[in-house]
Amino acid sequence: MTSALTDDRTAVPDGPVGSRLDDWWGRTLSTARRVALWRWAGPLGVTLLAAVLRLVTLGHPHSLVFDETYYVKDGWSIVHLGYEGTWPGNPADDSQPTTDQRFVDGQTDIFTNAAEFIAHPPLGKYLIGLGMLLFGADNSFGWRFAVAVLGIATVFLTAVIARSLFRSTLIGTLAGFLLAVDGQAIVLSRVTLLDGILTFFVVLGFGALLLDRRWTSRRLDAWVARRTAAGRDTLWGPVLWWRPWLIAMGLALGLATATKWSGMYFLAFFAVYSVLTDMMLRKRAGIEFWSSSAWLQQAPVSFLLTVPIAAVTYVASWTGWFVSKDGWDRNWIATGGERWTGVLSWVPDSLQNWWHYQSEIYGFNIGLHTPHSYQANPLLWLVMQRPTSMYYVGTNAGQDGCTATRCGEAITGIANPFVWYAAVVAVVALLVLWILRRRWEYAFVLMGVAAGYLPWLLYVDRTVFQFYTIAFEPFMVMALAAAIGLVLGRRDDPRPRRTRAVVWVGVYLGVVVLASAYWLPMWTGMQVPWDFVRSHYWLPSWL
């Protein structure tokens, strides 16, 4: 998949081929040094764009937005206590400030030592708390700093992974650009929720899995070459105990799971994919018993290289709870809980207490059916039927700088429609093309989408939200960038065809930019006239 704007600098044949833009770009990348510069300038450029869109006015609004009321306060208490502490209840007298108002006004140390039951593991909240330690708990920029930095890093990872996967700096840069300017990605980098943190670790694990695939391919080819040269058979392949990138994947997805349990879905999908990849790589290398070798020899070893690493990482994220005395359920057995008996009676009380806590978290999450006005059925996620409204403040003329009859400040977790819907089409197109062409790159991206989406179809009756899709959106924009590459074609295509493709892609990207500019006030809480706010609700269900 190449175009004139990729790293491919092969000679342009005589005749009317390519576009004039190709001619200019070929002259621009006329040296190896310039090609190397472009390889990093593209991803870094879109990362800089992402940083501007995420960091500028990050501290606005100076109030706890949506579920920041949980994660900001939990982040602050956990870095002090090692577990999430409770906060005072809201006063019955409406004339008195609420707990959130007191926190926003600078009363940040009013949490107590009493433990609070929580629904998610602690790692993401530790990272949030670290940002608050850097900038102060009363600084709303500090509340959101960690999620913003990791959101920016996710754009960079998306760009370099797509560049490596499709061997095209253009496609990688496009993938990073589409994520950089997308509204859901911007909002989840500017509002302190756990999902943006989860996404970073998931994409990190995805990149490690890609590196493992190439590392393993080289080792298998070298093994077969050595065996063949020595006149030995290649019936069974080698057992690869040292796979550093597979270990790194287990670590990254352990960190993802330590942020939100949905990280386990990615671990399961990525681990199975690694075995399937082993199987196909062994077949390609010429190993006779390629299937049995992958499943019977390598799969158990790959399991040991990933799952225990992820499990230890997850448990380690609870260190603050283990060393505390007052964490939730920390003294469950001592206060009447039933100690294990039989073959598990040797397990320390601290681990039994912790396991009971995990079972309570599981029960809470599985049984979460509380109605919410912005809950979104996973069956409708791909059509973006119910994006999440996270913040809205209305003002009248002359109030807080409002110059219209009526103004509003809104933060809505809605994707750029021209990115989201095009990405959905691209995912379907890549699925069809994979069936027809069996390109492993397509399967790799589709696996990332499937890992993030399909498990949620088991919970269509749960209270879940559209913004959960951020965890697999990087893979959707990779699919979209790959589809754009297919539309562009090759630099040696006939000039009329190539020129039309470049123009159409340019028009599409221009529409994406204009749409992002139009939606930006709705992603960042800018004060705008109410009529402008209302114009963004293209579907009744978006309001």
Predicted regions located by residue number:
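Aromatic-rich transmembrane-lumenal/periplasmic boundary elements in polytopic membrane proteins
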Residues: 58-104, 297, 301-302, 310-386, ...
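Transmembrane-helix motifs of polytopic, lipid-linked glycan transferases
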Residues: 145-166, 204, 429
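Transmembrane-helix signature of polytopic, membrane-embedded enzymes
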Residues: 40, 45-46, 141, 158-181, ...
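Short acidic/glycine- and proline-prone juxtamembrane loop motifs at membrane-interface regions
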Residues: 64-65, 147, 164, 187-197, ...
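Membrane-interface transmembrane helices that cradle and orient dolichyl/undecaprenyl
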Residues: 21-24, 28, 166, 205-245, ...
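Short helix- or helix-capping micro-motifs
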Residues: 50, 175-180, 187, 253, ...
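Start-transfer (signal-anchor) and selected internal transmembrane alpha helices
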Residues: 1-53, 297-310, 495, 499-505
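Transmembrane helical bundles and short interhelical boundary loops of multi-pass, membrane-embedded
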Residues: 3-4, 237-248, 253, 278-282, ...
